[in-house]
Amino acid sequence: MSAKEGSSHPSYAEIVREHAPEQTAAEKAAPQPPEVEEVLSEEPYQKNEKVVVLDEEDADAFLHPEEAEAKKESEKPSDGEKKGKTEKLEKEAKSVYSKACNFVNAHKVPASAAISINLLSLGAISAYLLKSRQSGTLNNRTLCTCTAIAGIVFTISAVFSKTPKTACCASKKSNKST
């Protein structure tokens, strides 16, 4: 039986030894693998340990704080440079935002098409649920899935249906004209 006291079941290694075929000469000549002992870590187990992944610059700053501080001080811009950078970033953000508004508005469909899509999808979901109910396969999972699909369809149609220009897009266009 096993080497452990009180164990009524043989170990996996013992079962393999009992049912293994005879070893060949080459197998007998091969060195035996080292015995593995169970070693428990002496450090306490940390269940909710969080790992933080740093990018290369942050990792360098963490490993070499003196160099990072010297680099930061040498890179400090003057007030004029700060103002220029801020204006440049604001201008770039405005152009990106206006491009995003134009892209979204260009790919929208008329409200009548969105309503038709909603009705069509709602009808298909209702037909599926009715068929499931009649066949006796309707369950909570099916209901939840169909509810989620309906919510997704309605959300997508709301996003991609034409509506009056939003205040933020209109304000951006009025800022361009001034």
From Swiss-Prot:
It comes from Schizosaccharomyces pombe (strain 972 / ATCC 24843). This is Uncharacterized protein C11C11.06c. Disulfide bonds: none annotated. Residues 1-89 are annotated as: Disordered. One of its GO terms (biological process) is protein targeting to mitochondrion. GO terms for cellular component: cytosol; mitochondrial outer membrane; mitochondrion; nucleus. Residues 44-53, 61-89 have a biased composition (Basic and acidic residues).
